[in-house]
Regions:
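N-terminal targeting leaders of membrane proteins
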Residues: 27-121, 210-255, 647-649
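N-terminal cap/lid segment of alpha/beta-hydrolase-fold proteins
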Residues: 256-304
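Short, surface-exposed "cap/lid" segments of acyl-processing enzymes
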Residues: 300-347
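Alpha/beta-hydrolase active-site loop
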Residues: 358-383
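Alpha/beta-hydrolase-fold enzymes
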Residues: 409-529
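Short beta-strand/loop motif that positions the catalytic acidic residue
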Residues: 584-587
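Conserved alpha/beta-hydrolase "acid-adjacent" motif
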Residues: 592-598
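Catalytic histidine-centered segment of alpha/beta-hydrolase-like enzymes
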Residues: 617-629
Length: 649
């Protein structure tokens, strides 16, 4: 989190705290779980299927680590954030890039020693060449010259990695005050890193380095914390996996293998083009009746009257995630105002927008979304009177499915409710059951590997994913993942979504399903129990019992389950969707969340001017491409013009 230049005194004080935290560990609850092997109720076949074990990171001193994480978050919020705001305002982007490059160049001795200690002499030579080139041609390291011109990429190694190569493979995860996430092994390695960092011995230079690095990193940190229900848990998993894979020198992506599953991962390339676009937004809150918290929404408003796009992200999509902001940026650049809320499975919406503790039933989820959008629309009109023309509801993935449901069930006679002139769905699933069973199957794709090969292949896949996210691949080239690797990554992401949803549902009421005791400072044990639940198991263990309790037309059996799932299939609303001039659908023929029957239904039952199906792209994996964006924009602009010219009935 903060400097890698750590004082020995601070580290010793942390060691004392570590000893205290070890005592706290004795208070942790063991993981307990229901034995589903003999269960013969609704959905029994799903509970008794073989499952891949979720990647587990032991955390024996979790109470201590969480306490330090909260302390560090306070520092980031109350000290670093104001500094970042000033720095971002007064420093041009080109200068920020130069400072970042210069600081990275100054870490050359650390990388050099880290490579030497591991016997990586060719890497050490490459690092030396990089340093000489960037320090001379690159004006003291302010301009990155070595990689784009000479092909010399950074060889990032450190003393902690050297310890790992020497045999210290696994180490206790540790959060240090001021320094953030590390392990005992890597924490000791920080002392060696500091010793070979020349800036450590120049107090003012070290201070500038530390302040600059954490200030530059703040926006990424803030979005990560805000977008995740439990950023500590995800941060721990990513940090430890990254360190393990770096030590093991797991392979990075190369050239591509084409598949719909791998193309889906292209969503990582959907990023804002202007890093300052987010700064032009405004964020407000509305109070949804019966919600526990206020619901935030973010908007970008044109100076003149313009169409207003209500943007719904995917399942647990965050309103400020890169993909959401990128779509908003494209729409804003074409003259529309944009407003967005977080997805219905996101922790923000679960706390501030939903009326029931178990999301997953399309009609109720969509109704909650519509209620929230109605409040948002009224609040925007109050703040920006006369600035909005047409209202367009645009949903991505699950947000697109909710968009289509609202299109099919709209009631234009209702007073004081937002009226949409156009409903646009991008990569919306058609059949919820097909989509979630596909995601469950994806998560278990490593079962096809031999048991002794499975751990290595899973970690190799995770290394590829981490490198892709860090921008180590070309956005114009498909990612090099086999279909099974891509499937596992997609399934893994959605398994964490269900974990967070179940945990939050259990906070509101005890469904009698989970057995592990939850503590204020320990979540590892209950998470391990929850992670045993697939999407379909969540449906049968939580959603079905809940609706069987509150609705007389739903019974706790397979008939009741099929009744709920039928209402989550868009074919049930075909009469109001097919041929509706206010409804548009954009998708990809090789989207795994669409069955062949779904694609055929869209192609044959919908009007030709309603549907655009691209040949490739997987699930949202081609939205970063200019040609795809151009087609969507052209069809949208034509549809808006048609709606404007068509007199109301």
């Amino acid at each position: 989190m903060l400097p890698r230049a750590v004082s020995f005194g601070l580290f010793c004080r942390c060691a004392v705290l570590l000893a205290v935290a070890t005592l706290l560990n004795s208070c942790q609850s063991p993981t307990r779980a229901v034995d589903w092997s003999q269960y013969d109720g609704p959905g029994a076949r799903y509970f008794q299927q073989d499952e891949v074990s979720f990647p587990h990171v032991p955390d024996p001193i979790e109470p201590f680590n969480r306490a330090v994480s909260i302390f560090n978050h306070g520092l980031m919020t109350w000290i670093v954030r104001p500094i970042h705001s000033v720095y971002w305002f007064v420093t041009p982007t080109i200068l920020q890039t130069g400072i970042s490059n210069g600081l990275d160049n100054a870490r050359f001795p650390q990388r050099l020693v880290g490579n030497f200690l591991q016997g990586k002499l060719s890497n050490a030579a490459s690092e030396t060449g990089r340093f000489l080139i960037n320090s001379t041609v690159g004006l003291g390291g302010l301009i990155e010259v070595a990689e784009p011109i000479f092909g010399l990429s950074p060889q990032r190694e450190d003393v902690g990695q050297a310890f790992g190569r020497w045999g210290w493979q696994h180490s206790t995860y540790l959060q240090l005050p001021l320094l953030g996430p590390t392990t005992v092994r890597d924490g000791i390695g920080l002392i060696g890193d500091a010793a070979v960092n020349p800036l450590t011995y120049v107090t003012w230079a070290s201070t500038i380095q530390n302040a600059s690095e954490v200030t530059i990193a703040y926006p990424t940190y803030a979005r990560f914390v805000e977008s995740n229900f439990d950023p500590y848990e995800l941060g721990r998993l990513l940090f430890v996996l990254d360190r393990e894979l770096s030590i093991a020198d797991a392979p990075s992506p190369g050239l591509a293998q084409a598949s719909g599953q791998a193309e889906t991962l292209g969503i990582v390339y959907l990023e804002p083009e202007d890093p300052r676009f987010l700064d032009r937004s405004d964020t407000y809150e509305v109070q949804v009746p019966v919600a526990r918290e206020r619901l935030p929404y973010t908007c970008w408003i044109q100076d003149e009257a313009a169409p207003l796009i209500f943007l719904l992200p995917g399942t647990s999509g965050y309103r400020l995630a890169d993909s959401t902001v990128a779509v908003a940026e494209r729409a804003f650049g074409r003259g529309a105002s944009v407003v967005t809320i977080s997805g219905s499975f996101n922790h923000e919406f679960l706390a501030g927008g939903t009326t029931n503790p178990v999301p997953g039933f399309l009609p109720d989820d969509a109704a909650d979304v519509y209620s929230a959008l109605n409040l948002v629309a009224a609040d925007l009109e109050r703040r920006y009177p006369g600035r909005f023309e047409e209202n367009i509801l645009l949903g991505l993935s699950l947000g697109g499915m909710q968009t289509l449901y609202l299109a099919a069930t709209e009631n234009p006679t209702l007073p004081e409710h937002v009226k949409f002139d156009l409903f646009v769905a991008i990569n919306a699933p058609v059949d919820t059951k097909h989509a979630i069973t596909t995601l469950d199957r994806f998560y278990n794709s490593p079962l096809e590997y031999e048991p002794h090969q499975r751990p290595y292949k899973i970690r190799r896949t995770l290394r590829k994913a981490l490198d892709a996210v860090r921008g180590m691949t070309d956005a114009h080239a498909p990612l090099n993942f086999s279909p099974s690797e891509a499937e596992f990554l997609i399934g893994l992401a959605f398994r964490t979504i269900i974990r967070d949803v179940i945990y939050q549902a259990q906070e509101q009421r005890d469904f009698g399903v989970l057995k592990t005791v939850r503590g204020n400072w320990t979540r590892t044990a209950p998470y391990r129990e929850i992670l045993q639940f697939s999407f379909m198991e969540y449906f049968y263990a939580f959603v079905l019992p809940y609706y069987a309790e509150i609705r007389p037309d739903v019974t706790f059996d397979e008939t009741g389950a099929e009744h709920l799932l039928a209402a989550c299939d868009l074919r049930a609303y075909a009469a109001k969707l097919c041929g509706n001039p206010k409804v548009l659908y954009f998708g990809n023929k090789n989207d795994s969340l669409l069955s062949p029957a779904d694609v055929a239904w869209l192609q044959t039952e919908w009007s030709a001017d309603q549907v655009v199906l691209f040949e490739r792209g997987g699930h949202m994996g081609n939205l970063h491409r200019d040609d795809v964006q151009g087609v969507i924009a052209a069809v949208l602009e034509h549809a808006i013009a048609q709606q404007t010219e068509t007199p109301p009935k």
